[in-house]
């Protein structure tokens, strides 16, 4: 019968405390990706490291309700609530995509109390690249 291999150290005791370290972030970048089906809001520091993120799907919206402006507003509020607690005062906003949640997410960001240095539209525009999807026939 084979003997079990004894482990010297236990993995449970290696890490004490939580992994997330709370650091003060005075300035950041808020990325809003608004597609027709969902809206994803990501808050990063100026170097691009993700601090907080939220989407309409993680806020509990399912199906076609994920693409609504109200879902985008809720997602933006959830993502920003965490960074306001960490002391973010100024941010720049980068909006990407053609979705309905663009304006609603921007409105929620303005209402949060963070000063916006500028709002930039970074939607990728093709120089006649891929063929677009066919028109819907309902």
From Swiss-Prot:
Feature: compositional bias, Basic residues: 9-22
GO BP terms: translation
Name listed for the protein in its UniProt record: Small ribosomal subunit protein uS11c
Region spans: Disordered: 1-22
Quaternary structure, from the entry: Part of the 30S ribosomal subunit.
SUPFAM superfamilies: Translational machinery components
Gene symbol of the encoding locus: rps11
Molecular-function annotations in GO: rRNA binding; structural constituent of ribosome
HAMAP family, A to Z: Ribosomal_uS11
Transmembrane intervals: none
Gene3D superfamilies assigned to the protein according to its UniProt record, in alphabetical order: Ribosomal protein S11
Lineage top rank: taxon: Eukaryota
Cellular-component GO terms for this entry: chloroplast; ribonucleoprotein complex; ribosome
Statement: the UniProt record of this protein carries the keyword Plastid: yes
